[in-house]
Amino acid sequence: MIQLDDVCFAYDDRPILSHLTETIEPGQAVLLSGPNGSGKSTLLRLLNGLIFPQQGTYSFDGTIITAGKMRDHAYSKWFHQRVGYVWQNPNSQLFCSSVREELAFGPVQMGLKPADIRQRVDDALELLGLTRLASRPPYTLSGGEKKRTAIASILTMNPQVWTMDEPESYLDADGLAWLEDFLPSLKAAGKTLIIASHHADRLGSLIDKELVVRGS
């Protein structure tokens, strides 16, 4: 369970999140909506333990997430196995020397057996249509190929919670059609989805509730 209690966050003196209180139950699909600059991306970074409330608390499965907690290597590893983050711009997410290495990075950090890692990577490459690109450096890919690689790199970790910032960005028509099938399959598998998007119409009946992020 994710619990936000009176969460506030500001950049310099500019309030971004203001007294946000919300509970997200396991298996729910939540749409984060609001205008550009309202704090949707900031909230996603906070949910991933990259930044922390300046007031109030964020709890994940009953544990309050703080900078000190995330400096605990064992806890940070446990947390990041359970919460995955697909960035809006895949260039912010991809850093390995090949697509295959990108998809293997998370499972390697999780300590999975080599055979299990290969299976996860091969399955994700096939599902995302990336098999022919497996040896390519991510920087040589098109925007849509990068975005699919970014999604696949989270898929191989199989997190319980998927946080996504504009997951449809960079995708072409075929990629969007694939995404519209993929997201319901995650929900059917019991995953929690937290999606920032300006395209609620594409999410249809997937969404259980909408959280309007209003900034200050």
Give the ranges of each region predicted by the language model:
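Conserved ABC ATPase "signature" region
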Residues: 115-133
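Catalytic Walker B motif of ABC-type/P-loop ATPase nucleotide-binding domains
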Residues: 162-166
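H-loop/switch region of ABC-family ATPase nucleotide-binding domains
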Residues: 197-198
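Conserved ABC ATPase signature
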Residues: 137-141, 145
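Conserved ABC transporter NBD signature motif
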Residues: 56-68, 79
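The feature captures the beta-strand-to-loop junction immediately N-terminal to the Walker
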Residues: 33-35
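Helix-to-loop junction immediately C-terminal to a conserved catalytic motif
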Residues: 48
